[in-house]
């Protein structure tokens, strides 16, 4: 990390810790406010090919309690060993009053000389640090502007209106999958869930080595993992793709990122061994470190990244970028029965930044169990979803083949013509293709409905929810997509109400239910575009016409029933029909 980026990130982290501690809010309460970071770079008058940079970090609201400048310098300077610059804090003589622009007295300024390439790298590192903050503190906003020789660029970082998930460890995580993928290479024509679904592991106690134990802290240091696949596998096809990569995000107390922007940082050394905490062989995976992380991306940059390869080192068809990525969030926090002072939290962050690898190595067994359990559960759910999709595909083929056998075996040209017109198909082959597409689209929509979640939810550790989640998921899927044959399922449909014409009804797809006119079939299959009111009136009209047609043509009763079934296909599969 370049020295300017290091200074900015450390100062931001210090201010947020101070902000949180002075506010005195309960654990898990989100900070709400805005910080401004501005860099003004002009050609240096003293150093050739260099830019003289003035960096200002300010709050647009009064930071609780203000800052003690001497204390700030005393605590921040040891964290900036490579920064030979003068730090200045805005005068607090005027109290907490704000000027017309809304800038509060909390304003830190320092100056450095950088070359243009280093400054560009600094800006990218700062942006990624801000992105890592807002996926945990989504109510915080950051305004970041850079002016180089008069040319200004500005960007605002925030996630206040994005979907979040409240974890049981007090962390609120942004779960919109766009935050974690930049240019996805998977097939986006397949339906997918727009959110990740993290599984929280149980907290693992951490032991601080004796040589590093002089922290003065009374409490317990713990690591809590959260694992998720991105994008959600509920949207994948029935093919079980291998995990393509693993991204690890490191967070310290108060949900603030640990500074480890490159693989040479001491805090990430323990992760160079890809199998140190996770046994990839049990998933038939071979992971290698990915040292080529692109800073110029809009997604959140992980602290550690692995990519999947074949054991021979060659990428195979099954080990490609089309599989999901495994996201692994590691939250290191301090549990104490007494309030922890700001200086202690700041010191703990400094300790973790320098010695995280040693601390995790000291507690390898418990950390490994915690991480492995979270990954195992994600993997099991992934396999379960893929198998469910396979059952869906098999059921669709049975349904389509059953309907096609009736259509192609019919000797009534008017029956075949009406069926083709219902789906706007030119021939039976196109009818089968469109029918399968309708089945697939709407069942996929039904399947994804179960992975939707509220804007903010609570997630408890996997040991408490594993059995219940799996049970509920099996129950939901069984209700929507039973494994029995189409004929057996349709035999149950008369319970919802079907006309009694004094004869035994068709058993191929079951008895007819509420009907809608043939012309409405195409409109109805557009998922949820047709209102329930309109569908109800169409059903009543169709019911009367069906009775009249059957009375006029007794011999064609079976095929009349089939006409009604074909015209009603989309309503039968429409997600809103069963809700």
Swiss-Prot record:
It comes from the Eukaryota. One of its GO terms (cellular component) is chromosome. Pfam families: DUF4554. It is found in: Chromosome. Keywords: Chromosome, Meiosis. Residues 538-554 have a biased composition (Low complexity). Residues 480-554 are annotated as: Disordered. Disruption phenotype: Male mice develop normally and reach adulthood but have smaller testes. Spermatogonia are present at the periphery of tubules but are strongly depleted and spermatids are absent, due to defects during meiotic prophase. GO terms for biological process: meiotic DNA double-strand break formation; reciprocal meiotic recombination. Its main location: nucleus. One of its GO terms (molecular function) is DNA topoisomerase type II (double strand cut, ATP-hydrolyzing) activity. In males, expressed in testis but not in other tissues. Expressed in testis from 8 days postpartum (dpp) onward, with a peak of expression around 12 to 14 dpp, at the beginning of meiotic prophase. In females, expressed in embryonic ovaries when oocytes proceed through meiotic prophase. PANTHER family: TYPE 2 DNA TOPOISOMERASE 6 SUBUNIT B-LIKE (PTHR14652:SF2). Heterotetramer of SPO11 and 2 TOP6BL chains. Interacts with SPO11. Component of a topoisomerase 6 complex specifically required for meiotic recombination. Together with SPO11, mediates DNA cleavage that forms the double-strand breaks (DSB) that initiate meiotic recombination. The complex promotes relaxation of negative and positive supercoiled DNA and DNA decatenation through cleavage and ligation cycles. Despite a weak sequence similarity, retains most of the structural features of the ancestral archaeal Top6B subunit (AC O05207), including the transducer domain that interacts with the SPO11 subunit and the ATP-binding fold, also named GHKL fold. Belongs to the TOP6B-like family. This is Type 2 DNA topoisomerase 6 subunit B-like. It comes from Mus musculus (Mouse).
């Amino acid at each position: 990390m370049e020295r300017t980026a290091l200074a900015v990130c450390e100062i931001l982290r210090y201010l947020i810790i101070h902000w949180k501690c002075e506010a005195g809010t309960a654990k898990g309460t989100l900070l709400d406010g805005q910080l401004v970071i501005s860099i003004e770079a002009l050609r240096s008058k003293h150093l050739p090919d260099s830019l003289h940079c003035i960096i200002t970090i300010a709050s647009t609201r009064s930071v609780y309690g203000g800052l003690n400048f001497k204390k700030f310098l005393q605590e921040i300077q040891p964290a900036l060993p490579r920064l030979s610059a003068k730090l200045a804090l805005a005068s607090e003589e005027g109290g907490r009053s704000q000027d017309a622009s809304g800038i509060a007295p909390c304003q830190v300024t320092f100056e450095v000389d950088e070359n243009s390439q280093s400054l560009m790298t600094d800006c990218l590192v700062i942006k990624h640090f801000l992105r890592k903050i807002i996926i945990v503190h989504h109510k915080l906003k950051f305004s970041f502007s850079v002016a180089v020789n008069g040319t200004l660029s500005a960007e605002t970082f925030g996630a206040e209106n994005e979907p979040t998930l409240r974890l049981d460890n007090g962390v609120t995580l942004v779960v919109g999958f766009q935050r974690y993928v930049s240019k996805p290479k998977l097939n986006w024509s397949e339906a997918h869930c727009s959110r990740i679904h993290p599984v929280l592991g149980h907290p693992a106690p951490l032991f601080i080595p004796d040589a590093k134990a002089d922290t003065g802290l009374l409490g317990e240091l713990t690591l809590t993992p959260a694992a998720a696949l991105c994008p959600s596998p509920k949207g994948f096809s029935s093919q079980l793709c291998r995990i393509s990569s693993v991204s690890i995000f490191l967070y310290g107390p108060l949900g603030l990122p640990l500074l480890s922007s490159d693989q040479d940082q001491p805090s990430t050394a323990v992760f160079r061994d890809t199998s140190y905490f996770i046994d990839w062989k049990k998933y038939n995976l071979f992971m290698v470190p990915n040292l080529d992380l692109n800073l110029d991306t809009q997604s959140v940059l992980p602290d550690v990244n692995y990519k999947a390869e074949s054991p021979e080192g060659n990428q195979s068809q099954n080990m490609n970028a089309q599989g999901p990525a495994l996201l692994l969030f590691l939250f290191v926090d301090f549990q104490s029965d007494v309030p922890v002072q700001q200086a202690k939290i700041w010191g703990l962050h400094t300790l973790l930044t320098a010695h995280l690898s040693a601390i995790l190595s000291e507690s390898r067994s418990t950390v490994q169990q915690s991480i492995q359990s979270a990954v195992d559960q994600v993997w099991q759910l992934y396999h379960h979803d893929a198998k469910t999709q396979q059952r869906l595909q098999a059921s669709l083929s049975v349904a389509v083949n059953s309907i096609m056998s009736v259509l192609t075996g019919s000797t009534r040209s008017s029956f075949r013509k009406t069926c083709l017109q219902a789906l706007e198909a030119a021939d039976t082959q196109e009818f089968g293709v469109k029918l399968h597409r309708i089945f697939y689209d709407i069942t996929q929509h039904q399947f994804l409905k179960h992975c939707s979640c509220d804007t903010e939810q609570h997630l408890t550790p996997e040991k408490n929810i594993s059995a219940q989640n799996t049970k509920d998921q099996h129950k939901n899927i069984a209700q929507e997509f039973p494994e029995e044959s189409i004929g057996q399922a349709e035999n149950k449909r008369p319970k919802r109400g079907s006309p009694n014409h004094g004869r035994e009804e068709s058993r191929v797809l079951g008895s007819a239910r509420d009907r809608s006119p043939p012309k409405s079939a195409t409109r109805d299959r557009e998922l949820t575009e047709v209102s329930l009111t309109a569908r109800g009136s169409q059903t009543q009209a169709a019911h009367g016409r069906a009775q009249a047609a059957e009375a006029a043509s007794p011999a064609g009763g079976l095929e009349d029933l089939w006409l009604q079934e074909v015209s009603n296909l989309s309503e039968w599969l429409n997600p809103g029909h069963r809700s």
